[in-house]
Structures are given as structure tokens and as C-alpha cells.
């Protein structure tokens, strides 16, 4: 009886291990893929060139680079996608959510053309229609 119970427990554990391995991975920031809930910032127009993808608001782009490159994203963004279905994404010209702004509604994308190309230094999400805390 003890042996049968031991085999049953081992079988259940094996099945649990298989299902755990089949669970989808969570999105990872800056993995080079624009996943649900992320801000995806692109080096070039039309969502091309290097990509920086993140699940977090950033008060400063200083030191951040496009995935797989050494190119910093500060003042080098030409297009973006807001993959968060619920919150607006706000881009700021300066660090600490200051300066000119560009609001990107939940679930939308944009090209930063003309004077707004290569301008952004921080971003945050908010459910509000105007800006970030302290911005």
C-alpha cells in the first residue's frame, strides 16, 4: 500500500511538472519583443530599427539602450507603441517628466515626426488624460 501511494504521488508530481513547463512565460522588459502591457520605443519611424520595450515608467532614459545595441534611447526615439490596454502613455522632453509632452492613448501607436522626432527623455503611464505625477 505504501509503495502504491508513493507511485501515485510521484505520478502527480510528474504531471504537475509537465504543466508548469507549459505555462506561458511572462513578458520581460527589454527582451526585444513588443509584448502586451509594454511601452515599446523604436529608433526609426514605422516601428523599425532598435527597440526598447519596458513594463515600467522611466523618469530618465539616461543609460538605457535599444535592445541588442549600444545605442542609447535618450533623444533618439522616432516611433512608439503603447501596448497597455488600459493606460495612456506620456512621453516627456526632459528627465523627471518635465518639458513638452506627447500623449499616446491606451493601445495605440505613433510616429514622432518633425520637431517631435528624437526628442524624448522620459515616459510614464497614467489613467488620466493629462500627464504624470510631478510632470
Annotate each language-model stretch with its function.
Residues 2-13, 18-135:
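Compact beta-sheet-dominated domain cores in extracellular/mature segments
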Amino acid at each position: 500500500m505504501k509503495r502504491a501511494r508513493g507511485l501515485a504521488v510521484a505520478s502527480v508530481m510528474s504531471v504537475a511538472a509537465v504543466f508548469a513547463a507549459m505555462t506561458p512565460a511572462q513578458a520581460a522588459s527589454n527582451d526585444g519583443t513588443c509584448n502586451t502591457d509594454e511601452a515599446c520605443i523604436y529608433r526609426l519611424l514605422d516601428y523599425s530599427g532598435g527597440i526598447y520595450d519596458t513594463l515600467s515608467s522611466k523618469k530618465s532614459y539616461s543609460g538605457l539602450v535599444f535592445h541588442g545595441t549600444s545605442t542609447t534611447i535618450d533623444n533618439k526615439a522616432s516611433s512608439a507603441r503603447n501596448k497597455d490596454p488600459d493606460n495612456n502613455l506620456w512621453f516627456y522632453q526632459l528627465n523627471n517628466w518635465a518639458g513638452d509632452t506627447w500623449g499616446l492613448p491606451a493601445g495605440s501607436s505613433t510616429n514622432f515626426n518633425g520637431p517631435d522626432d528624437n526628442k524624448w527623455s522620459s515616459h510614464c503611464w497614467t489613467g488620466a488624460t493629462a500627464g504624470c505625477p510631478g510632470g
